């Protein structure tokens, strides 16, 4: 689904699940090569020719070490390779179980990205994790420049396939489980945001911790996006958006409280646009995980900003770059956005009333009192946890 067409497989016992899955895939050419060094350079040549990552598979132990020269060559010459090394589970490591070495970060600093996957588990949550990790690995092998990605995959026995009716497997997946997987990356010099996927829908913009070089330009860009789509903006306390709140009438700061209310059931969006990191609010994160709607992540960095492993699509550009050449349109406030803004106003009044009537001092009230009484524009430094 990402776009892989070729897998080079070095046969071995521990990599049996990978070999069979790739060999049985109708759209992947699986090529078996016994010698690992030869296989790795063949995969390198194939990737050079196609411009797409070639998947290279081997079993546990020293097999993966034979890929090392090709890994260095691929990284130095900018060739996309995705290496899958099978491994024994944790309980069979460091105990002379045989055909076992430390395969974590086997190739040092040469890969663009590397990680060890969790043990396979037939649950929707873990399959979502696997889906998003594979999508991220594919993107890392191609962007910002082509190179090597190494995934270490532990497997427990039994390694051979277990017969299971296809219908049982298919019922585990929601109809849109694979919908957000795209087989290409946006062009490096121009990011085309999917306005047609967003306009006319109920949606939110969420913005986490950010330290942009030009905070006002960053806030103006998000305010522009918000008002063009009539999407409310749920802004992290440590985001500069709250310092420039006058730029955007759709700014929501009390979302953590709003999402604890019964009214949150009526606020489920069709689209979520995430700018940078997720806000730290556990309430927001749990809500996003429960609703699991398509999420579009906009950030210039190539990191994976999806700890929820949801249906995400990444745009590797800053929010200001992403909105270059976008023409403004006059759009009225949508009923969905009005709901959020109304709840924001009500919740703010309730919070102020509660803190005003509260006689006992605590961290939350101290921060609120300071913000109410200091002159506008006065810098305030708040420590961790409750006060923030």
State where each predicted segment sits:
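Short acidic-hydrophobic, aromatic-tinged amphipathic segments that line or gate anion-handling sites
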Residues: 33, 113-119, 250-259, 312-326
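Glycine-rich phosphate/diphosphate-binding loops that line cofactor/substrate pockets in enzymes
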Residues: 1-4, 46-51, 140-145, 191-204, ...
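Conserved thiamine diphosphate
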Residues: 99-147, 322-323, 328, 334
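Conformationally flexible catalytic loops at phosphate/diphosphate-handling active centers
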Residues: 136, 140-200
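Glycine-rich, anion-gripping cofactor-binding loops and their flanking helix/strand elements
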Residues: 207-296, 304
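Thiamine diphosphate
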Residues: 16-91, 280, 388
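Phosphate/pyrophosphate-binding active-site segments
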Residues: 287-388
């Amino acid at each position: 689904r990402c776009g892989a067409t070729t897998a080079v497989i070095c046969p071995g016992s521990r990599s049996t699940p990978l070999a069979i899955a790739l060999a049985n895939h109708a759209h992947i050419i699986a090529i078996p090569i016994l010698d690992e060094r030869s296989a790795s350079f063949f995969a390198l040549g194939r990737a050079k020719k196609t411009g797409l990552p070639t998947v290279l598979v081997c079993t546990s132990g020293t097999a993966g070490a034979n890929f090392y020269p090709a890994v260095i060559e691929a990284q130095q010459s900018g060739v996309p390779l995705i290496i899958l090394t099978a491994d024994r589970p944790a309980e069979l490591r460091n105990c002379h179980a045989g055909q076992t070495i430390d395969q974590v970060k086997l190739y040092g600093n040469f890969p663009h990205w590397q990680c060890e996957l969790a043990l396979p588990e037939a649950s929707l949550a873990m399959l979502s994790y696997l889906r998003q990790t594979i999508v991220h690995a594919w993107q890392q092998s191609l962007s910002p420049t082509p190179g090597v990605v190494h995934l270490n995959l532990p497997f427990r026995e039994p390694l051979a396939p277990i017969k299971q009716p296809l219908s049982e497997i298919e019922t585990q997946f929601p109809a849109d489980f694979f919908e957000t997987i795209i087989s290409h990356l946006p062009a490096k010099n121009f990011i085309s945001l999917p306005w047609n996927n967003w306009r006319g829908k109920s949606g939110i913009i969420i913005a986490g911790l950010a330290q942009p070089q030009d905070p006002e330009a960053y806030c103006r860009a998000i305010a522009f996006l918000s008002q063009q789509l009539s999407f409310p903006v749920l802004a992290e306390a440590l985001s500069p958006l709250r310092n420039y709140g006058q730029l955007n009438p759709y700014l929501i700061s009390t979302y953590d409280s709003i999402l604890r209310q019964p009214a949150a059931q009526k606020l489920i969006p069709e689209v979520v646009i995430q700018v940078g990191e997720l806000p730290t609010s556990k309430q927001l994160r749990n809500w996003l995980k429960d609703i699991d709607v398509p999420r579009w992540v906009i950030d210039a960095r190539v990191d994976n900003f999806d700890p929820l492993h949801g249906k995400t699509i990444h745009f590797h550009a800053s929010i200001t770059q992403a909105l270059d050449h976008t023409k403004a349109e006059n759009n009225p406030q949508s009923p969905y956005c009005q709901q959020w803004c109304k709840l924001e106003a009500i919740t703010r009044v309730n919070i102020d009333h509660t803190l005003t009537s509260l006689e006992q001092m605590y961290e939350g009230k101290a921060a609120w009192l300071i913000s109410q009484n200091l002159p506008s524009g006065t810098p305030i430094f708040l420590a961790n946890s409750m006060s923030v």
